[in-house]
Amino acid sequence: MKIKTRFAPSPTGYLHVGGARTALYSWLFARNHGGEFVLRIEDTDLERSTPEAIEAIMDGMNWLSLEWDEGPYYQTKRFDRYNAVIDQMLEEGTAYKCYCSKERLEALREEQMAKGEKPRYDGRCRHSHEHHADDEPCVVRFANPQEGSVVFDDQIRGPIEFSNQELDDLIIRRTDGSPTYNFCVVVDDWDMEITHVIRGEDHINNTPRQINILKALNAPVPVYAHVSMINGDDGKKLSKRHGAVSVMQYRDDGYLPEALLNYLVRLGWSHGDQEIFTREEMIKYFTLNAVSKSASAFNTDKLLWLNHHYINALPPEYVATHLQWHIEQENIDTRNGPQLADLVKLLGERCKTLKEMAQTCRYFYEDFAEFDADAAKKHLRPVARQPLEVVRDKLAAITDWTAENVHHAIQATADELEVGMGKVGMPLRVAVTGAGQSPALDVTVHAIGKTRSIERINKALAFIAERENQQ
């Protein structure tokens, strides 16, 4: 049997991390078994579905490189198929027309609740032989079995059973002729030959209804697996108050897709004590029986740790392709300065996100208007004038501009003046970067370049001279 899974989001908003994890698990299961992964857009909610949301879902899937083998399919383009199946069910007696008014249904609901009963349709039209005009408004309901139970072996939670007496006759076509979500899902899974449905636990109550419809159609019933929800670190359901919940927001905040995928796969699944997984390892080791039944807690600090790991572990040239977008957002002109791959090597240890890297790298490419006030007050003092003059001249004398030779120039300055490296290094750092912190000074000065470094040292000396005149 060929394994076939699907990811079927509703385009009413962005792709959130819960949906991304479900997509990842479905994708991994298919890839692990050499099967196929289908993308289906469940856009039957015409009022809430938007083209922007569809685009956001596609963007998120593409950014995570969760490529699909079929689709995207759109439910709104399959209404003729759904209605043909409903008409067939009406002929076979597995569905019926219901003419009950909203007022009657509301009164029935209130009566049942007053008795402490679970609100459900009482089947009045199921057994009615009243004649109705062809144009009289009606819905179509599925004639759910009235006895027995529905049992399915959830691949994560184990056997789950629902009594058919708890399930009422589901509406499968509205009065306007449009099919309902639960019915469309059934026909789609049937037509697309889905073998395994991996989805959130909020769909568990839909499963027995969908199984009953599949059986009424003599269609194969897929295997189901329901993934637990994701909570914030406070134990409450993950929401915007816990930080970013949109996949593309994590892109915007400077996370690598490898980091988010690695974090999401471990958010409810484990393989021994291993924390870091390549995409190939995820595919190789992923199984549904290793997915936890318990809710997972989203921990941003852990994601940040993973992101920092991947910034330094992945090839700098690859990381640079993702950094480029953030550089563009900061409007930094990188034509005069180090290659982005070299910048990744320079700042990788210091920066936990690509956004942070882009926001702190400007001095490598563009001159700064002024020095950081605190750093200048502390290090650009009259006592720093001589070390800066000497190191400037030694840097100017370098014919082979390498980080090693820059280091020798700084060391030689300290030796000549008989001072510690800090007495030279700190004023030099503020002079060339405008700030009190940077990567290792020799590689920083080397990356900034000879001409620009000397110009900035002269600017710092002018700043010191002006400071002396004001005293």
Curated annotation (Swiss-Prot):
GO molecular function, one term: tRNA binding
Protein family membership: Belongs to the class-I aminoacyl-tRNA synthetase family. Glutamate--tRNA ligase type 1 subfamily.
Keywords: Aminoacyl-tRNA synthetase, ATP-binding, Cytoplasm, Ligase, Metal-binding, Nucleotide-binding, Protein biosynthesis, Zinc
Localization in the cell: Cytoplasm
Residues annotated for Zn(2+) binding in this entry: 98, 100, 125, 127
Motif placement: 'KMSKS' region: 237-241
Disulfides per UniProt: none
GO terms of biological process kind: glutamyl-tRNA aminoacylation
Manner of cofactor binding, per the entry note: Binds 1 zinc ion per subunit.
InterPro entries for this protein: aa-tRNA-synth_I_cd-bd, aa-tRNA-synth_I_codon-bd_sub2, aa-tRNA-synth_I_CS, aa_tRNA-synth_I_cd-bd_sf, Glu-tRNA-ligase_bac/mito, Glu/Gln-tRNA-synth, Glu/Gln-tRNA-synth_Ib_cat-dom, GluQ/Sye
Reaction equation(s) it catalyzes: tRNA(Glu) + L-glutamate + ATP = L-glutamyl-tRNA(Glu) + AMP + diphosphate
The protein's name in its UniProt record: Glutamate--tRNA ligase
PANTHER family linked: GLUTAMATE--TRNA LIGASE, GLUTAMATE--TRNA LIGASE, MITOCHONDRIAL-RELATED
Cofactor names: Zn(2+)
GO cellular component terms, semicolon-separated: cytosol
CDD domains in alphabetical order: GluRS_core (cd00808)
Alphabetical list of Pfam families matching this protein: Anticodon_2, tRNA-synt_1c
Record flagged with keyword Aminoacyl-tRNA synthetase: yes
Enzyme Commission number: 6.1.1.17
Quaternary data: Monomer.
Purpose of the protein: Catalyzes the attachment of glutamate to tRNA(Glu) in a two-step reaction: glutamate is first activated by ATP to form Glu-AMP and then transferred to the acceptor end of tRNA(Glu).
Presence of the UniProt keyword Protein biosynthesis in the record: yes
NCBIfam families xrefs: gltX_bact
